[in-house]
Amino acid sequence: MSAPLVHHAVVTRGHGGAIVTAEWPAEGRQTVTAIERFSYDAGPIVRRVQQLKADHPDCFIVVDAEGLGDAVWELLDHPRRRGWRLYQKHGLEREELTRVLLVAVERSSFGFAPGLPEEQAMKRALVGLTRNPRAEGPGSELAVALSLAIDDHRPPAPRIY
């Protein structure tokens, strides 16, 4: 059995930063294996991302450009190599993040590893998101990071009208 793919999603917003890690097995549900929260400071986030990449060179890392994301990306020395992505969508284009989460929750396509310290905060963020998809309050960085971690980052299927 092959090792699961590992995705790390990095988000910084006005209320703080988050890194969410999800493992993608060859078959079955994705598992959120880590939820890390940070103050609104690029330095510790950059150091953690560098450590994650050093520990798992084959992992995929996506950085949200909003908030301090552009600065985090810059401090990571523009990692425009395989396994890195800067998520640069703004405004209405970001609604896809909500869609990804709502579909994943409804389909139960991911779960949480047992004992995650921030799992309850994540669940509160998800409830807030389902009530108000444009919410920008505390915890919204968790929901955005989760969406980026569980999305496969392929172009969306064409819409049929």
Task: State the predicted function of each range.
Residues 1-87, 95, 99, 109-161:
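RNase H-like, metal-dependent nuclease domains and their acidic two-metal-ion catalytic environment used
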